[in-house]
């Protein structure tokens, strides 16, 4: 049983049985018999009934609307003209137009569209233009196909335009499109407005229960397939322009930026430098990352600039110390600080723990243990407040990790080029290949090299300052050594004189020993040689005479006279000899340092290039 007396479901076609009367006339949607007495609601009648029959004049307005001649209806009866120029909700009205409307009885007529009924209306246009219109019901009905027609719109429609009427409220699932001014006030001024009405749910009893007409959706494809189609299978225009778009997509892929369009129904493909066709790629070599785990080095990456973090290093140390429980035996140290890309910086720390059994000794906490402790979920909020985004343990990769890295090429790098880079590695134990994809990676590598060069320059300046300091200390030490040598010689001479006097005093009146006798003989021979006129004594006498003559000349000219005793002369000779030796030692030291500096200067460019 249906809701309204038929044996079919909603929206199905059926022929209801005729009845002789009832409370509201015939069943809903049926045709009332004219031979029966006029019912109270919705039936046709030949005489004036009490309620709902065909009267001579309508209930609202004796004549037709705005001067048109028509028979006025009651509520739901068959009429010639509605109360306001047409039916209540379902037909297409016109001001002053002669309209003939055929309405069903009850709720199956034009009042609310009926369930399954399709009323038809024949009317004249606004200014005499002939038209034939199928007026849909007001609420479009459940399961009813909305009829499309071509007629001038009523009321406020355009002049001679063509429109398609649609349900007043669209119904469930109907879609209606008009031009500018369509809908309630007609179509576009002077332009035809095309309207397409599609039942959304297809009615109760239809074959479709979906929003709109079901369409076949294309199967989703992967990003790699979309990238390949955007170069090899462009189908946007269907002509030779697709080849031009494909070439443009290929050009964008080679430089690694842009968007590639390949279909009207698919989204464009974003291009990144990691794609396989990007030409701006290279492979360099970097030192093996990380250090020994026992050193305990952990890198803290900050999302702030270096200038904002560097002045607050002590605050960072205090905050980290509080995270470790503020233990007195835990000491936090900063190993280095450097700038990263995208306005970030990195601080490398390590933590020392003093041993309880040996307070003067300490050990470093392992880098992996320190990193795992800082990456706990309970400490993340405090680190985020400090500006730390991640904590990484700077440890050397193990053999498995290194093998996996070398055997699997990075995304967008040709495997053959990656294998060739592995084979060309100058020192596999110290360096690893690193890809440079795009200009951002190249810029970052150049920046890292500049920072490393600055570090080397600072180290060289430090070495130069240390060498200068060592030279000063060496000169001072050399002068002190010479001074000590001079004092040692003086003391040696004094000791020798004391020993001679002591021996002379001790051996007074005793005979000479055979050794002393041999020594005396040698000394006498030496004295005879020196005292010979043609030997050293004669030369010395000649030199002394010349010196006296020169002294006399200086005295005659008013020069100052001077005289040196023998001891002063000996001391002067000794001092001059020491000065000569000191100058020789200093000259040798300077020559050695100059040779060392030449080696450093020649090796500096090679160090910078490496």
From Swiss-Prot:
GO terms for biological process: mRNA transport; NLS-bearing protein import into nucleus; nuclear pore organization; nucleocytoplasmic transport; protein import into nucleus; protein localization to nuclear inner membrane; protein targeting. Pfam families: Nup54, Nup54_C. Coiled coil: none annotated. Residues 4-554 are annotated as: 25 X 2 AA repeats of F-G. The keyword Membrane does not apply. GO terms for cellular component: nuclear pore; nuclear pore central transport channel. It is found in: Nucleus, Nuclear pore complex. InterPro entries: Nup54/Nup57/Nup44, Nup54_alpha-helical_dom, Nup54_C. Sequence repeats lie at residues 4-5, 24-25, 28-29, 41-42, 51-52, 60-61, 66-67, 75-76, 84-85, 89-90, 95-96, 112-113, 115-116, 127-128, 142-143, 159-160, 169-170, 172-173, 180-181, 185-186, 189-190, 201-202, 204-205, 237-238, 324-325. Keywords: mRNA transport, Nuclear pore complex, Nucleus, Protein transport, Repeat, Translocation, Transport. The keyword Transmembrane helix does not apply. One of its GO terms (molecular function) is structural constituent of nuclear pore. Component of the nuclear pore complex. Interacts with Nup58. Interacts (via C-terminus) with fs(1)Yb; this interaction occurs in a RNA-independent manner. Interacts with sbr/nxf1. Interacts with Nxt1. Component of the nuclear pore complex (NPC), a complex required for the trafficking across the nuclear envelope. Essential for the nuclear import of nuclear localization signal (NLS)-containing proteins in an importin alpha/importin beta-dependent manner. Together with Nup58, required for transposable element silencing regulation in ovarian follicle cells. By interacting with the nuclear (Nxf1/Nxt1) and cytosolic (fs(1)Yb) components of the flamenco (flam) transcripts processing pathway, enables export and subsequent piRNA production. Belongs to the NUP54 family. Contains FG repeats. FG repeats are interaction sites for karyopherins (importins, exportins) and form probably an affinity gradient, guiding the transport proteins unidirectionally with their cargo through the NPC. FG repeat regions are highly flexible and lack ordered secondary structure. The overall conservation of FG repeats regarding exact sequence, spacing, and repeat unit length is limited. This is Probable nucleoporin Nup54. It comes from Drosophila melanogaster. The lineage of its organism: Eukaryota, Metazoa, Ecdysozoa, Arthropoda, Hexapoda.
């Amino acid at each position: 049983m249906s809701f309204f007396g038929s044996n079919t479901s909603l929206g199905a076609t059926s022929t209801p049985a005729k009845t002789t009367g009832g409370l509201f006339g015939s069943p809903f949607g049926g045709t009332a018999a004219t031979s029966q007495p006029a019912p109270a609601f919705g039936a046709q009648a030949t005489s004036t009934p009490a309620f709902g029959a065909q009267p001579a004049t309508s209930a609202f307005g004796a004549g037709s609307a705005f001067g048109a001649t028509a028979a006025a209806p009651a509520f739901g009866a068959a009429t010639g003209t509605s109360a306001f120029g047409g039916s209540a909700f379902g037909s297409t009205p016109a001001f002053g137009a002669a309209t003939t409307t055929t309405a069903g009885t009850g709720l199956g007529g034009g009042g609310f569209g009926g369930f399954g009924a399709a009323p038809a209306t024949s009317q004249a246009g606004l200014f005499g233009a002939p038209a034939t219109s199928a007026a849909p019901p007001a609420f479009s009905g459940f399961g009813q196909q909305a009829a499309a027609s071509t007629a001038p719109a009523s009321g406020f429609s355009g002049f001679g335009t063509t429109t398609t009427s649609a349900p007043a409220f669209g119904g469930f699932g109907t879609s209606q499109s008009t031009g500018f001014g369509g809908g309630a006030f007609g179509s576009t001024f002077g332009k035809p407005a095309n309207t397409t009405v599609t039942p959304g749910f297809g009615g109760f009893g239809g074959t479709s229960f979906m929003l709109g007409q079901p369409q076949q959706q294309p199967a989703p494809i992967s990003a790699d397939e979309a990238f390949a189609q955007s170069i090899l299978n462009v189908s946007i225009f269907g002509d030779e322009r697709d080849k031009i778009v494909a070439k443009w997509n290929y050009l964008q892929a080679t430089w690694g930026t842009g968007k590639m369009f390949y279909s009207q129904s698919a989204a464009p493909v974003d291009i990144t430098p990691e794609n396989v066709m990007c030409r701006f790629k290279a492979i360099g070599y970097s030192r093996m990352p990380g250090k020994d785990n026992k050193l305990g080095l952990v890198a803290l990456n900050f999302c702030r600039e270096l200038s904002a973090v560097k002045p607050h290093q002590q605050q960072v140390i205090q905050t980290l110390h509080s995270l470790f429980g503020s233990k007195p035996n835990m000491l936090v140290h900063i190993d280095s600080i450097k700038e990263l890309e995208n306005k970030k910086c990195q601080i490398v720390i390590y933590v020392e723990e003093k041993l309880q059994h040996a307070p003067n000794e300490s050990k470093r906490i392992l880098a992996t243990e320190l990193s795992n402790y800082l990456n706990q979920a309970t400490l993340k909020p405090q680190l985020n407040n400090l500006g730390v985004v991640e904590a990484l343990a700077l440890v050397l990769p193990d053999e498995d990790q290194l093998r996996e890295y070398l055997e699997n090429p990075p995304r967008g790098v040709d495997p053959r080029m990656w294998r060739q880079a592995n084979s060309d590695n100058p020192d596999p134990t110290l360096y690893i290949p690193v890809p440079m994809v795009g200009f951002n990676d190249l810029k970052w590598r150049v920046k890292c090299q500049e920072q490393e060069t600055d570090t080397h320059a600072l180290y060289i300046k430090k070495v130069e300052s240390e060498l200068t300091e060592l030279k000063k200390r060496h000169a001072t030490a050399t002068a002190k050594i010479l001074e000590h040598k001079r004092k040692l010689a003086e003391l040696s001479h004094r000791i020798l004189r004391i020993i001679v006097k002591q021996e002379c005093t001790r051996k007074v009146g005793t005979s000479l020993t055979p050794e002393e006798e041999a020594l005396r003989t040698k000394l006498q021979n030496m004295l005879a040689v020196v005292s010979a006129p043609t030997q050293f004594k004669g030369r010395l006498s000649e030199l002394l005479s010349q010196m006296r003559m020169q002294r006399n000349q200086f005295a005659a000219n008013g020069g100052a006279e001077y005289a040196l005793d023998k001891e002063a002369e000996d001391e002067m000779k000794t001092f001059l000899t020491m000065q000569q030796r000191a100058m020789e030692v200093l000259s040798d030291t300077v020559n050695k340092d100059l040779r060392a500096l030449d080696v450093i200067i020649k090796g500096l460019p090679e160090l910078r290039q490496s």
